[in-house]
Amino acid sequence: MSALAWAHPLVAEWFINKFGTPTEPQELGWPHILSGRTTLISAPTGSGKTLAAFLACIDRLVRKALAGELHDRTEVLYISPLKALGNDIQKNLEVPLGQILQMAGERGLLMPQIRTAVRTGDTLAPERRAMLKCPPHILVTTPESLYILLTAEKSRAILRDVETVIVDEIHAVADDKRGAHLALSLERLEALTYRSPVRIGLSATQKPIEEVAHFLSGNGRPEPEIVNIGHKRKLDLAVEIPATLLGPVASNEMWDEIYDRIVQLSEQHRSTLVFVNTRRLVERVAHNLAERIGEENVGAHHGSLSRRLRLEAERKLKEGKIKVLIATASLELGIDIGTVDLVIQISSPRAIAVALQRVGRSGHWRGAVPKGRLFVTTRDDLLECASLVRAVRQGDLDRLIIPDCPLDVMAQQIVATCAASNSSVSRPATLSSGNGHVARTFLSGNSSDQSPDDPGWDEDELFALVKRAYPYRNLPRELFDSIIAMLSEGIAARRGRYGAYLHHDRVNRKLRARRGARLAAITSGGAIPETALFTVVAQPEGGIVGTLDEDFAIESNAGDIVLLGNTSWRIRRVEGKSGRVLVEDAH
């Protein structure tokens, strides 16, 4: 009980009834979070680090609700690298919030409901409008949607009152351009809010963990607190080698042997999660396993499937309605799929951290030992998997490298920042940030993109904002100025210049967005490469099954059979103009 002495009696009682005692990440993380320090919690999957971050926030909201001080404003912002993970977190938040509300009612306490909402690319327009009208107390979003919220004129206002930012699975974005994009969005959020939000990061174990912590906190701020539980958790990890002689490629005989062995292992466990490295292989493995143990016992999960089919596969595994689920990295992160007894990885996962993350999807209960089997298909696989298992047993990790000053991402964010300042929502201007605590005043803006009344961004102030993002800590001023020149002067082409998104007032050293800059920033932002996809539509129902790459779809003909979601579909027609592939069940 002493570990929860800080919590409101309702919150403490709920936690004890539900979990008994705190886990190590929770017990060590709460004091830092409650002190208002930037905190990174690094612990294995299933160790309770998500609740470690949320419980302090829930406690604060419960206290405000009981005191009649809970207003219609967003105070907690949760950022997930996956839309599916965000949806899952929101569902899991509804349970404790509902139970605490019920407990309050049973004790005769008047407590308004603490609301949660999800804002991602899947959020419907009516839900977005409702969110603007009545902001949720806890908002769940993705890095890309946060960027849009910060840039769009109407949505910026709901972020003004954010007091806590939780970045989940931070290791999944820190080492690529998507992470640099998020780091700049966090600095833009910092400049927008009334007070500096407390930042909480949740991560699988990384090396060096200090680098991830600095990525979270930003440049030039007080040292972040690190709760590092380590990854030397006991694992039941082994390499499965087929009897067939290994060669440079896997033979059909070897694949049959692998399928038979997976079936054998699945019969020894209640639920089995199989990871492969490509979407195509998901369908191939699912099809072959279904032939052996029945379609009703096998599921498929990857990014080309529709959201409905992915959620259905997750639900079936969680409810024990299927024995085996085959997935790509779409299930690698902490989506709640219930109790998994065994994780199988076909071919090398190519990274130690990925192997740990995937094997860690099993054994999600106290005292359980995660169990994983690595199936090799070639000689190279054998060498990689053997080295990987040895590294895991020795406690070694891959070294995480954060990209240094990605200029394309910076250009996007500069345009978005300047466009957002031309908003009817006033912008806090940074006056000083020497000790990491930013003092602010407010500059009134205007909703017109080219209003002379808009003060714009001061060059030095914008440069300081960019430099506070950890990936840009070493950004030279000359390089920043060259990007500003490109964005204000445009790029020379045969028919003149294009791509000029900013007005640059060199006399007053101010930057303002040109007309159309906000729209360009919103529609062209992000660091995820775009791919042309055709929507697969089942006939006659009209339900969306998933997507196919444009090249594959165009080269397909009526009558061809495609596999999606462990189901064979016969193509009826490919509609090039509408980007649709009409299919029917081939069975």
Task: Indicate where each model-derived feature is located.
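Intrinsic, low-complexity polybasic segments
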Residues: S424-T430, G434-T441, D449
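Intrinsic-disorder-associated, low-complexity terminal segments enriched in Asp/Asn/His/Tyr and depleted
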Residues: N446-D449, D454
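Conserved nucleotide-binding/hydrolysis modules and their immediate coupling elements
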Residues: E489, R494-H587
